[in-house]
């Protein structure tokens, strides 16, 4: 893992250099769409002591100067499946954003939604020889524990300290200069499939771009869609994309768990296409314009003209004038959405979400906009549920403030104001890359 440590530090330095030059692109590669926004930076901002160790990661103010979205191609379950098609789509979206911004970008930060994420927790503890916590003590405690293997072909995507303790004083965001005898840390580590990560890196390079960072789409969506109190007191963000549904849990303003359900809104569209025998573009139109999950007595009488949007007239009167009731449409959509939510429920149960002090659930992503989803999710998940829109950032167009762009906005926030990661610290050479892990569920229940 020494190579990983150095690679992440290199990307972090590339991000800082791009920000110093003033321009950095954010690239959200999803199953249904690919979005690129170009950020203009005003230089390093003032570090905020309340955000943790903070200065290691570096923070800056920014505004959006270019933005473009196109249909995704070659991506399945949030992972690149057909390299050539995805490359063409990425080139197209980056060129569109560059044209609007009037600048050329060379460095991008990208998101990854699939890749079979797995959460782990780790704990480290050291003795303070000086009786006070210094910068090197923070680095030493992060490298203090031995590590079992993550498994073959796994890569670390995030490794964030979420809690420090000095002697009996726990819940510290920044332990530096605290007086004591022992320093302990809890850290959340998120790993992903290495092949999916390598394919993303290869795609970016084929587009003549340099990768200045990679972030979890579920983590990014949570940063954008959860309000400050939810991130502090505990909440789950459910990012319902086209091919995958990301799950992230936040507590004390840190992500402490992440996973994904390999189902999304595209399956709902496919069910409509097969159930009503209509093309996929017609099924998508029916889902977005007339879809729903809660049937009423009037839905049997509300007829939707399908033939008018299926394509050119065929000459067959019954086909060209075909209609379906909204009740039939809801009857097709609801079982699949229930299946997705059941998968989310299983993930939350495995994470011990019921033990959280606050059990707020925030739905975001494109599929979260289906009418009636919040009510259905409330019954299945058994929690307080709301639909979350991403935070407004300066210069962002209105069409990019919808829930489907939560991960994009969160990735911009992550680029400008990253939380500290393991590789932000100067590790002792002999210990860099040596960290101890426990399964996240056990760690979560024991430490929070």
Predicted regions located by residue number:
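Hydrophobic, well-ordered secondary-structure elements that form the walls
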Residues: 344, 363, 411
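Glycine-rich phosphate-binding loops at beta-strand->alpha-helix junctions
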Residues: 113, 192, 291-294, 356-380
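A short acidic Gly-Thr/Ser loop motif
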Residues: 27-33, 112-113, 237-244, 250-253, ...
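A conserved active-site cap/scaffold subdomain adjacent to cofactor or substrate pockets
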Residues: 262-286
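Basic, amphipathic juxtamembrane/active-site segments
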Residues: 43-51, 251-271
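Nucleotide/phosphate-binding catalytic cleft detector across ATP-hydrolyzing
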Residues: 1-236, 255, 279-281, 288-330, ...
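A general structural motif
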Residues: 336-345
């Amino acid at each position: 893992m020494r190579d990983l440590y150095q690679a992440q530090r290199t990307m972090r330095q590339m991000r800082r250099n791009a920000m110093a030059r003033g321009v950095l692109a954010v690239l959200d590669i999803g199953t249904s769409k690919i979005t690129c926004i170009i950020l203009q930076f005003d230089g390093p901002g003032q570090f905020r002591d309340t955000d943790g160790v903070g200065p290691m990661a570096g923070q800056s103010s920014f505004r959006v100067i270019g933005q473009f979205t196109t249909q995704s191609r070659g991506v399945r379950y949030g992972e690149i499946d057909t390299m050539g098609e995805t490359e063409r789509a990425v080139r197209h979206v980056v060129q569109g954003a560059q044209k609007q911004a009037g600048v050329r970008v060379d460095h991008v930060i990208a998101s990854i939604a699939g890749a079979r994420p797995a959460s782990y927790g780790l704990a480290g503890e050291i003795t303070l020889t000086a009786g006070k916590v210094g910068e090197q003590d923070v680095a030493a405690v992060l490298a203090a524990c031995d590590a079992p293997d993550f498994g073959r072909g796994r890569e670390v995507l995030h490794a964030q300290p979420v809690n420090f303790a000095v002697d009996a004083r726990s819940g510290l965001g920044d332990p530096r200069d605290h007086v004591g005898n022992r320093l302990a840390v809890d850290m959340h580590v998120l790993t992903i499939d290495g092949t999916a990560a390598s394919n993303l890196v290869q795609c970016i390079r084929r587009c003549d771009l340099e990768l200045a960072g990679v972030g979890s789409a579920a983590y990014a969506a949570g940063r954008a869609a959860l309000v400050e109190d939810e991130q502090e007191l505990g909440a789950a963000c459910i990012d319902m994309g086209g091919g995958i549904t990301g799950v992230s849990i936040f507590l004390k303003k840190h992500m402490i768990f992440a996973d994904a359900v390999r189902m999304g809104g595209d399956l709902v569209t496919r069910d409509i296409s097969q159930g009503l025998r209509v093309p996929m573009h017609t099924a998508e139109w029916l889902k977005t314009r007339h879809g729903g999950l809660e049937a009423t007595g009037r839905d049997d009488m509300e007829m939707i003209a399908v033939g008018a949007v299926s394509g050119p007239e065929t000459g067959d009167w019954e086909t060209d004038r075909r209609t379906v009731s909204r009740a039939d449409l809801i009857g097709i959509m609801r079982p699949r959405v229930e299946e997705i939510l059941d998968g989310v429920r299983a993930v939350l149960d495995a994470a011990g979400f019921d033990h959280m002090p606050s059990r707020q659930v925030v739905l975001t992503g494109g599929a979260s906009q289906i009418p009636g989803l919040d009510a259905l999710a409330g019954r299945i998940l058994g929690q307080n549920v709301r639909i979350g829109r991403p935070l407004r950032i300066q210069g962002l167009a209105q069409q990019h403030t919808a829930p489907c762009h939560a991960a994009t906005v969160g990735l911009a926030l992550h680029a400008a104001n990253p939380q500290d990661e393991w590789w932000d610290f100067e590790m002792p050479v002999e210990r860099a890359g040596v960290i101890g892990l426990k399964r996240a569920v056990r760690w979560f229940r024991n430490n929070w």
